[in-house]
C-alpha cells in the first residue's frame, strides 16, 4: 500500500541507473497487479451495474498500465 501521509515518499534523490529503474518498474508492475486484483474483487462483490461498469473500466486501465510498463522494460533491456 502507498505511503500517502508522506508527500515526499515518491521522490528520488538522484537519477537512477537503468538497472535501478528496471527494479523500480518491477515494483510498479507489482502495484498495478495488486490494483487489478482488488478492483476485480470489488467488481465481483457488487450487483450495482454502474459500479460494476466503473470498476471494470478502472481494472482494465490498470491492465493497460502493466502492458506499458512491460514495454518500457523491454525497451530498457
Identify what each model region corresponds to:
Residues 1-77:
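Non-heme di-metal
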